[in-house]
Amino acid sequence: MIKVSTEGLTQRYDRFVDDCIIALFDKEPADTDYNISITLKKFVGDNGSHAGFCLGDEESSEIEVATHWMYEDDEVVPYTDFEIAGSIAHELTHAKQFARGQINMVNNVWKTNDLSTDCDHLPYEEHPWEVEAYAYETILTDIYWG
């Protein structure tokens, strides 16, 4: 069972999270035990430059999603509800990848279909886990938020 706890999310975001969990984790075995904690906070990262972040392993993930970001002149800019939903979908995709053992917090290796691929040489946006997360970010927000 996928257990999700949230902090700072409105009811609409909670419904969106539920829809994303069903879409992302539908192929997991029935006896899967995985815990996901999602916290909505004003800023993520030291300088408010991240829209979201996911730390995890094969047992649980901790997700933080920002409601605002810091512009170069220290101007505080709010994310739109749609952008926040996109960040939630993106980070939930990483939680799925952690749960399946496809990624870890140690190295830049992508594991899928019993193959491991070293991705140290790839730019950030070409890492397979980011390609998948950006794709699901778009798909899930278009289907369940739009």
Where are these regions (language model features)?
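An active-site-proximal "capping" alpha-helix that borders the catalytic cofactor pocket
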Residues: 128-141
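Active-site catalytic microenvironments for nucleophilic, acid-base chemistry
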Residues: 95-103, 139-143
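Active-site recognition of the HExxH zinc-binding catalytic motif
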Residues: 86-99, 133
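Post-HEXXH active-site segment of zinc metalloproteases
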Residues: 78, 82, 98-130
